[in-house]
Amino acid sequence: MKNKIDYSIYLVTDRDLMSTNTLEEAVEKSILGGATLIQLREKECSSHDFYETALKIKKITQKYNIPLIINDRVDIALAVDADGIHIGQSDLPATVVRNIIGEDKILGVSAGNLDEALKAQKDRADYIGVGAMYSTGTKKDATSTTMSELKEITQKVSMPVVVIGGINKERIKDFKEINIDGLAIVSAIIAQKDIEKATRELKEEFYKIK
């Protein structure tokens, strides 16, 4: 399964921004609109609530055969048997996480520059999330990555590259000359009134540059 992952439209959840009553509803609407990968990101809730939420979201992702990635929490990812885990530079080292989760699970690593990207590849990551490409309200402490840095990363790593940070419909064309594999999106999907329509439009714009 790992080699056939479609990274095109990668929803990263944020319950503080969601336009729906429940996270499950937001996730399902995004999948119906064409989301190809879901990352469950829960920074504020207890471990118990994160676990319960992950089980609910997994039911939806399984229904549509969409991979579920857990942000940061290796224990939650293993507890619910998620498809993978995404870690940042301040989380557990990627080599340690790979040894814990094994080779069959997806391992994603955030990378803000070429050195971090090359290290993630050496540490056996399956993909990297590069950014923040633009300033973003969801991660106020994120340092930005330039287009030239992104281009160099895509030329020097041999794994899928997903961009993140302030991505919206209007900005997708900025990546036309760069060989990226997907868009990791938060507010441009989950905060929209019509999540399904917003996701569909993002996917249409992404395919225009592929």
Curated annotation (Swiss-Prot):
A Pfam family this chain is assigned to: TMP-TENI
Binding-site list for Mg(2+): D72, D91
One example GO MF annotation: thiamine-phosphate diphosphorylase activity
Reactions performed catalytically: 2-[(2R,5Z)-2-carboxy-4-methylthiazol-5(2H)-ylidene]ethyl phosphate + 4-amino-2-methyl-5-(diphosphooxymethyl)pyrimidine + 2 H(+) = thiamine phosphate + CO2 + diphosphate; 2-(2-carboxy-4-methylthiazol-5-yl)ethyl phosphate + 4-amino-2-methyl-5-(diphosphooxymethyl)pyrimidine + 2 H(+) = thiamine phosphate + CO2 + diphosphate; 4-methyl-5-(2-phosphooxyethyl)-thiazole + 4-amino-2-methyl-5-(diphosphooxymethyl)pyrimidine + H(+) = thiamine phosphate + diphosphate
Record's keyword annotation contains Transferase: yes
UniProt-listed GO biological process terms: thiamine biosynthetic process; thiamine diphosphate biosynthetic process
Signal peptide location: none
Cofactor: Mg(2+)
InterPro entries reported for this sequence: Aldolase_TIM, ThiamineP_synth_sf, ThiamineP_synth_TenI, TMP_synthase
E.C. number(s) listed in UniProt: 2.5.1.3
Cofactor note: Binds 1 Mg(2+) ion per subunit.
CDD domains recorded: TMP_TenI
Binding site for 2-[(2R,5Z)-2-carboxy-4-methylthiazol-5(2H)-ylidene]ethyl phosphate: T136, G137, T138, G166, V186, S187
Pathway as given in its UniProt record: Cofactor biosynthesis; thiamine diphosphate biosynthesis; thiamine phosphate from 4-amino-2-methyl-5-diphosphomethylpyrimidine and 4-methyl-5-(2-phosphoethyl)-thiazole: step 1/1
One GO cellular component term noted in the UniProt record for this chain: cytoplasm
Sequence positions that bind 4-amino-2-methyl-5-(diphosphooxymethyl)pyrimidine: Q39, L40, R41, E42, K43, N71, S110, K139
Keywords: Magnesium, Metal-binding, Thiamine biosynthesis, Transferase
Function of the molecule: Condenses 4-methyl-5-(beta-hydroxyethyl)thiazole monophosphate (THZ-P) and 2-methyl-4-amino-5-hydroxymethyl pyrimidine pyrophosphate (HMP-PP) to form thiamine monophosphate (TMP).
Family of this protein: Belongs to the thiamine-phosphate synthase family.
Protein's recorded name: Thiamine-phosphate synthase
Organism of provenance: Clostridium botulinum (strain Alaska E43 / Type E3)
Gene name tied to this protein: thiE
